[in-house]
């Protein structure tokens, strides 16, 4: 299964459920608003090329991060296959139009990443109008959800991922927790 197909499949799923989830509650972090993978929304459980799909948008890159949604926008962590461009993509939930593709980090010597992983596996989260995205030792960033402006970046997390980044950041009070 090719990378582009997997991304389209993932986007197709998100698109099919985005309307229901967005109306019930924002799916703003890994495993949803409470971090438990549950929602009150009743998304479709079946879809095809034409059934229960509102739109499809190709997103080039290789990323295993889950999409998150808040305030009518879907946010995706993304990376090139070689890990030399790490970005945050914003898609309009209603139309599927890519609103922003924000380059956050451009490592010249990316750390090793196992071929079955990606450089963009951690899921971002959205809170209080800010999007937080973590790429492991390559960097962590905070972006303004309304403008796409990069509010801050950090590249000082010393860690050896062994197989590539995979730890999604979580908010706790006024802290950002990364592992």
Regions found by a protein language model. Name each.
Residues 8-19:
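Bacterial N-terminal signal peptides
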Residues 21-179:
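Noncatalytic, solvent-exposed loop/strand surfaces
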Residues 1-5:
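N-terminal secretory signal peptides that target proteins for export/translocation
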